[in-house]
């Protein structure tokens, strides 16, 4: 099963991954692999300190204090290791339920597989076109951290809010 979505009544932008990696499942939270660039990148984009790998509450805070939401496209699937290419038997998450609880205006997919799954299964339900962003996964090592920050920052600039919590 996937993790619960992280959102609040102030979440305007939804960031979607594909499915938790084995390291993320060990940590019981999103982007738990120590080489995944997601949390350092989000800290840089929001002006927050980089959270400790084990500090789930700090990670949730980065998302919630800045008008964002975080989830995965899949509720369940069959996968070998962390290889998105091996995903089969997909069951998409119930995005309709989330959209009744948060005023999501924009969807951003972390990588091509999340984008492909969103477009096929979730876009028909949400009606919100997604923006495909480069994956923060260590498997996408060709994309430098500076490039990730630049591309993600440009995409999210109208949605990252200043913390009021």
Sequence positions of predicted segments:
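C-terminal capping/extension of enzyme domains
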Residues: 4-12, 33-34, 80-96, 119-165
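Catalytic phosphate/metal-binding cores of nucleic-acid and nucleotide-processing enzymes, i.e., regions
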Residues: 106, 112-115, 124-129
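Structural motif
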Residues: 12-13, 106
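Short, solvent-exposed loop/turn segments at secondary-structure junctions
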Residues: 20-23, 36, 75-78, 112-115, ...
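Residue-level signal for well-ordered alpha-helical scaffold segments within enzymatic catalytic domains
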Residues: 40-44, 97, 101, 120
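Internal catalytic-core helix/loop-beta-alpha segment
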Residues: 65-113
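Short, surface-exposed acidic-centric catalytic microdomains
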Residues: 23-86
